[in-house]
């Protein structure tokens, strides 16, 4: 991919946004489970961090981890992510499903994006295929676990995710600038876990103005692949930059 005459900016702001109460009505299921085969579980290397807002605030333990390999397709205004999520059941209840918020799917008309695509959904410990359940709200989906997740237990799931960026001057969108070059703004671009509170997963309807996002903090390890002619501006610590052909990997 070649882009000339201007240095373009991508803003990747990974906001931790979540919300989920799931009802069993109006759900569409893509079932690809195989319960007949048993696998030996692979141990999960999970990172746990304890933080404080200030010296007077209580400590908060961050246990959920996202490992994302993000590739931006500037020609087709979309991106692909291979995403692994390590999830700890921090409640007193047993979970048979876990729920995600998928905000990019809010832009579902043909000119301003599409509903995202999720494939290759599986349990990373056993390599068992998992069931994807679509909610009536396109920004919500759930994953049926291979086995019940008891309190304090850890599981890890992985899937391939493709999302389409709308033509919008907003925190999630792209703008065409001089010489048909583009700026991409990619806030809330990764699916995130919904908090579990009061006996259920919490989510609220998406609305365009204001803040409707609710989630818990998590650890993010993100690898971003962009054209060399682009500059990445993002939160977090930049650990390494690699050049491969016409791409820049950070």
Predicted regions and their residues:
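Solvent-exposed beta-hairpin/edge-strand motifs
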Residues: 46, 95-128, 187, 225-230
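N-terminal, polar/Ser/Thr-rich
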Residues: 7, 15-17, 21-80
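Extended, low-hydrophobicity, Ser/Thr/Pro/Gly-biased non-transmembrane segments
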Residues: 160-250
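Asparagine-centered strand-capping/turn motif at beta-strand->loop junctions
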Residues: 87-92
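Beta-strand-rich interaction surfaces with strong enrichment in secreted/lumenal proteins
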Residues: 68-71, 85, 130-132, 144-149, ...
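A surface-exposed beta-strand-loop module
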Residues: 39, 108-180, 246
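Intrinsic-disorder/low-complexity, polar/charged segments enriched in Ser/Thr/Lys/Arg/Asp/Glu/Gln
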Residues: 65-67, 78-84, 97, 140, ...
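N-terminal Sec-pathway targeting helices
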Residues: 1-12
């Amino acid at each position: 991919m070649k882009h000339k005459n201007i240095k373009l900016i991508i803003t990747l702001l990974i906001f931790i946004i979540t919300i989920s109460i799931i009802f069993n009505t109006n759900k569409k299921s893509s079932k690809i489970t195989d319960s007949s085969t048993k696998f030996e579980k692979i141990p999960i290397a999970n990172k746990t961090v304890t933080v404080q807002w200030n010296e007077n605030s209580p400590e908060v333990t961050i246990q959920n981890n996202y490992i994302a390999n993000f590739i931006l397709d500037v020609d087709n205004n979309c991106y692909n992510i291979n995403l692994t999520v390590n999830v700890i059941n921090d409640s007193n209840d047993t979970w048979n499903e876990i729920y995600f918020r998928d905000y990019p799917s809010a832009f579902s008309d043909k000119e301003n994006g599409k509903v995202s695509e999720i494939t290759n959904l599986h349990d990373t410990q056993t390599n068992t295929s998992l069931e994807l359940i679509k909610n009536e709200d396109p920004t919500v989906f759930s994953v049926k676990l291979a086995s019940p997740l008891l309190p304090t237990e850890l599981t890890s799931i992985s899937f391939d995710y493709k999302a389409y960026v709308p033509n919008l001057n907003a925190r999630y969108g792209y703008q065409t600038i001089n010489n048909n070059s583009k700026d991409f703004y990619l806030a809330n671009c990764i699916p995130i876990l919904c908090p579990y509170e009061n006996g259920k997963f919490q989510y609220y309807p998406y609305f365009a103005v204001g803040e409707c996002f609710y989630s818990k903090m998590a650890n993010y390890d993100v690898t971003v692949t962009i054209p060399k002619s682009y500059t990445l501006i993002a939160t977090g610590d930049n650990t390494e930059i690699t050049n491969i052909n016409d791409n820049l990997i950070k």
